[in-house]
């Protein structure tokens, strides 16, 4: 077979043969096989050219995708799937990129965890979930998590939460709120509890009284329409307890309020 045409089409070249066959190839393919118009190639050579063109095209696409930011093997595979590249070729591209250090799931995981240590607010459980979604293996994630101590991150987050909620919640509710937020962010309950215990959080009696009377004003208006006497007192006690107030503080406030 003879090459009758080599014409550039954006990032690829259109190669036409005298038997009517056409295929798109990369510039790397032209250089590798020293292709030119009127060159004669065999069926076997054509197959090699087509396979390498797919590989070269796939690698160029992957490198373009990686030029914006680091990505995992799974992310690159999914990107290449959009371009209908043969699965075997995709695997060859991935292997080549890993060999050249363009893809390294271990380094990716380390970088994400390290950034979180410096300025993030996530605990190990949430990080594990996020990295797993990126296709990183459980063993790779665990290996990298072992390199870090999350107590400083938990303490940093706990301090921010304290600033947000202090003076707005009674002591027990404040503890519950901070610990719940920390566990939602991926810290274990024990780490969350330690972080809270290390806080300089003192909800004084005056603040508690102010909060409980403010809450009583709101709840009394709601329940006094339906209840009175003992039943009203019970309803108010229940709702204040759910809000995190101690029963002794509730009883004291109700004696003064009712």
Swiss-Prot record:
Chief location bin: cytoplasm
Domain of life, per lineage: Bacteria
One Pfam family of this chain: RecX_HTH3
A GO CC term assigned to this protein in UniProt: cytoplasm
GO BP field: regulation of DNA repair
Keyword Cell cycle listed: no
Its job: Modulates RecA activity.
Family listed: Belongs to the RecX family.
Protein name (Swiss-Prot/TrEMBL): Regulatory protein RecX
Source organism: Streptococcus pneumoniae (strain ATCC 700669 / Spain 23F-1)
């Amino acid at each position: 077979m003879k090459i009758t045409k080599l014409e550039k089409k954006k990032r690829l070249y259109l190669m036409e043969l005298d038997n009517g066959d056409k295929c798109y190839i990369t510039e790397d393919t032209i250089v590798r096989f020293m292709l030119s118009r009127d060159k004669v190639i065999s069926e076997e050579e054509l197959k090699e050219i087509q396979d390498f063109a797919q590989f070269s095209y796939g690698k160029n696409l992957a490198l373009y995708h990686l030029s914006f930011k680091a990505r995992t093997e799974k992310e690159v595979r999914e990107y290449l799937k959009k371009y209908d590249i043969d699965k075997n070729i995709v695997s060859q591209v991935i292997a080549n990129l890993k060999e050249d250090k363009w893809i390294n799931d271990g380094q990716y995981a380390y970088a994400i965890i390290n950034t979180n240590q410096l300025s993030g607010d996530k605990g190990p459980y949430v990080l594990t979930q996020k990295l797993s979604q990126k296709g990183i293996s459980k063993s790779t994630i665990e290996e990298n998590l072992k390199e870090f101590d999350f107590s400083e991150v938990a303490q940093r987050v706990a301090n921010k939460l304290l600033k947000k909620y202090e003076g707005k919640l009674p002591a027990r509710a404040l503890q519950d709120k901070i610990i719940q937020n920390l566990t939602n962010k991926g810290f274990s309950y024990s780490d969350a509890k330690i972080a809270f215990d290390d806080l300089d959080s003192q909800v004084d009696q005056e603040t508690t009284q102010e909060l409980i009377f403010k809450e009583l004003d709101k709840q009394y208006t709601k329940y006094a329409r339906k209840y009175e006497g003992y039943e009203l007192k019970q309803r108010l006690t229940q709702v204040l307890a759910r809000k995190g107030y101690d029963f002794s503080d509730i009883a004291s406030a109700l004696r003064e309020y009712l």
